[in-house]
Amino acid sequence: MRILSAAEIEELNVSENEIAVCALGAVILYLKDTQKKDEIEAPSELEMYDTEKYMKLDMSARRNLELTKSMMTGDKRHSLLWVIDKTKTAAGKRMIRSWLERPLMSIAKITKRQNAVGELCDNPILRDEIRQALTGVSDIERLLTRIVYSTANAKELKSLQSTLEKLPSIKAKLADSSSYLLKAVYNDIDLLEDIRSLIDSAIVDEPPFTVREGGMIKEGFDKDIDELKSIMNDGAGIIASIENEQRELTGIPKLKVGYNKVFGYYIEVTNSYKDLVPETYIRKQTLTNCERYITQELKDLEGKIIGAKERCIALEYQMLCKIRESISNEVKRLQKTARALATLDVLASLSEVAVNNNYVCPQITNDGTINIKDGRHPVVEALLEDTPFVPNDAKLDLNENRCEIITGPNMAGKSTYMRQIALITLLAQIGSFVPAKSAQIGIVDAIYTRVGASDDLATGQSTFMVEMNEVAEILKNATSRSLIILDEIGRGTSTFDGMSIARAVLEFVCKQKNARCEISFLRRIITSLLLWRGFLTELRIIQ
């Protein structure tokens, strides 16, 4: 395996980060083992993941909020991703999932996404044209990986060509865009005409599935391949042509060109004409009535005819390798265009969802206020179909509304309400519009959740132990900018002990961590306990 030089590591901007260098080495070693190659090319660029730039979402939050898969079914359906993913391309699906799992912390970046989504919302004709144009676009990133690792076949190259042919139309649609992000997409789309032209001129329209079948290279692209194909397709005609040519040159009317397994191709002349045989003929066999000769030209042709198919397949494969190498040299241009198309796909998807579901553009601030008017749970609303979702308000800030206590009976919607606030906050920070009449979202650095009850048989932990461990992690990691969702904590033990734990946790979250918190209780007695502590001024009770 090739070792990266200090200069290469420096170019990747990771030389000063020892952990990043170690991680890069591990990735390259993994690629070597899985791709079965002795030498792995260094990556053209690396993106450093800065945790300070993205909202923190631990596995518990991802699971409880059902971001990418449903807890009930274990698949995408009925998750938040299922609601917002209306993308048309494979790369777009990967990117929208990445956005969902990494909400932004920068108001400027969020606003750029919002403006692009808003522009597409306001221009339905443009949005529909873009989504239609993206339909059928191949996965350039995956194709490029196969091309770089020399595993792409001719059909996959034609698939890439088909996608490149769509680029001029897609780019033209963005020419008059006004938002920063759509302008950036326009500038980043490289038409890649040289690559499209190369594939179009080299590969037949309907190539075979495997590269060892031959028949991949177009006629006229390579003269050696054309010659071999001509020999393969018209071997008998070529022999007849040589026979007529030699008759005219020698004046021997009964000259024949034949073939046997011993001598291969030969020229046969009867004894009555052997005096006319030119000196360039080489005698190979004497028979009773004739002589048999060979020429250098005939031997060369024999070699071409006999091995024409094998050599043609080999030459076509060599040519395919050269084409793949030429495309690999343009990897940065292809990657940039692929990312631009994926970004456009995601923005079009978010705008489609916003228009179809009556979402609004939230106001993003740094003051810690979460103020939602007529908010709706995006997944529950999608599942209700013809039944309207009953909207509700929410307000959290860093002052007297730091915490909301939600009380009510089982199946009253307490968990749905709390998850709704978290999901609206998360959607706002990925740059999406949100299901509400209006929304003001103060940037959240993390969402922590403690929802549901289950034990862990593998580690021998009871339901109560699992719950307390999760709460401890939240109390340790939460900051004043975090949003905490606590659903009936303390239910894994006795009523009195559970309320004591709940009160202590609530005081710590609001007084020590100063975090915004949503907490639900089945038992209304908790209100009187908090009132007794003089703590009610910092809470808003929802019943």
Task: List where the protein language model places each region.
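Amphipathic heptad-repeat alpha-helical coiled-coil/stalk segments that mediate oligomerization
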Residues: M1, A6, M55-M59, L67, ...
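ATPase nucleotide-binding head domains, primarily ABC-like/P-loop NTPase cores
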Residues: N17, K88, W99, T270-K299, ...
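Amphipathic alpha-helical coiled-coil segments
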Residues: I110, V117, R127-A133, L160, ...
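Charged, surface-exposed helical/loop "interaction arms" that form contiguous linear patches used
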Residues: Y149, N153, T163-K166, E219-G220, ...
